[in-house]
Amino acid sequence: MRLARIVLSVGVSALAVATVVFAFGGSGIELRDADRGAEARGGAEELQEQYDETQDRLEALALARRQGTLGVIERIRRAPAPGWAGERIVNRTGDDWEPAIAADPNDPFVYILHNRFGGEPACPSNCPDPAMILRVSKDGGKTWGAERYLCACRRVHGQHDPLIEVVPQTGEVYAVWMNDFDIHFSKSPDHGKTWSTPVPVYGNVAWGDKPNFATSADGQDVYVLYNGPTGGDVHAAISHDAGDTWEQVRVTNDERYHFAYGTAVLPDGRVVSTQNSFTYSGPASAAEGPVLQHVYSSDDEGKTWSEAVIDTLELGTVCTSELCYADFYDSGPALAADEDGDLVIVYSGASEPEGPRTVYGRSSTDGGRTWSSRVALSPSGVNAAFAAAAGFGDDTIRIYFADQRTGRWNVWYRSSQDLGATWTAAVKISDATSGTAYKNAKGFIEFYGDYGEIAVTDGGKTIAVWGEGPSYLGPGGVWFNRER
C-alpha cells in the first residue's frame, strides 16, 4: 500500500521520539489506551487516511457479497502457455492484495504472504483488518497448506505491505510488514509453523511506510529500507544479529518522496536498494514533474550510503479507476541479484507526461556502481508497469510485468540467461480467461495493489504472484502461476 495522496512533512526530527497523542472523533479511529503510543507515532492524517481507505474497501466488499460478484463466481477457464501450470487464485472468496513470495533455494518450500480485507478475524477482538495471511507449499507450489495468520497482533488497526524472504544458508523464514505505520520483523525456524514475537525495527523514527528488505546469506545481516516522516526521505533499519536488535540510519534529506521496491545483500556484504521518487507539489498534493530511478548502496554495513540516479522518466497515464490516485501505475524499480552478485534492475516510466509507460532493464557487474544502457522489455506505445524480478544461478534473471496491450491488464513473463543482454519472448502468465467478475479473455480490469513478486524454486522453476481486481477499490484477489 503506497501512501501517496496525503504527503506531509511531520514536525519532528527523523530521529526524535513522537510525544503527541492523536485522537480521532466521529467515524474516525477510536484510540485504545494500550495502543496510544503507536497511534501517535503514525501521524494523525496518515492513519486517518489509511483507516478511511480500509472502510471504503470493506464497504465495497460487503456490496460485492450482496451482489454475488465477490471472488470466483463461475468456472475458471485457463489457456496456459507451454511449460506453465496455469493461473490459480489463492483464495476463492478472499479480498486479498499486495502479495509477496519467497522460495527456499535448497528445499521445495514456497511461501506466499498477503493481506486480506474483511476476512475471519485472527483473534476474538481488537484484531487487525486487513490482516496478514501466510500460505506454505512443501512441493514447489503444486499444493498449498491451510491459511495461517502471521501474527494476531491485537490492538493494531491494520497490517500492510507484506514482505517475506528465506535465509539461503539456513532455510529460516523472515517476514517484514507494517502494523499501522509501525514496521515489524518476525522469523520462523520451522517453515512458517511458528513465528517469533514481532520486533519493531523503527527505533525513534516517528513512522515508516513502504518497506523493502533483504538478508545476508547466513541471515545475520538484515536491512529494511523505507520512507519516513520527513517528507518521504529514505531510512534504513539495520540488524546484525538476525533481527533481534535494530539501529536506524537516515539515508536522504531532500525534497522528494521515495519508495523502496528492491533490496539485495551481495556476497561481499554490499547492500543495494532500488527506489523511485516523486515530488507531490501539484494541486491537492498530486505528483508532478519527473520520476527519478535511484540506486542506493552501502559498503559499511549500512552506516553510510551512496546514491546514483540511473534514469529520469515522466509520470505516465493516470489511473482513473475507483479510489485510485493518479500515479498508481508509476510503480517502482525491481531488483534481481544472481549468485555472484551481478544485478538487473527492471523499472517503468513514460517518455512524455501522461503517456504510456515502457518497462526497461539495465544490468550491473560491479555491485550497482555502474549500469548498462537501458533495454526496452515491453511493447512500444502500450502502457506497462508493475515489474518484478528474481535472480538464479549465474547471470539468469526471471521477470514479469503487466501491460494493457489488449485494453485490459495482463501479466507477461520473460527471462534472460546472460544478465539481460538478451531476453526470451514475452509469455502471458495471467492465463485465466474467466472465473471472476473482473476477468475475461482479454485480461483483468485492474492491477490490485502496488506490487507482486516472482521467485525461483529449488528446482529452478519460476513461480509468480500478483493481485487482480475490478478497480483499485476492489474487492480483488491474489493469483499465481508456476512453471511445470
Where are these regions (language model features)?
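N-terminal Sec-pathway targeting helices
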Residues: M1-S13
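Hydrophobic alpha-helical membrane-insertion segments, chiefly the h-region
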Residues: S13-G26
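Cleavable N-terminal signal peptides
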Residues: V10, V21, G474-P475
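Extracellular, repeat-based ectodomains that mediate carbohydrate processing or recognition
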Residues: G26-R484
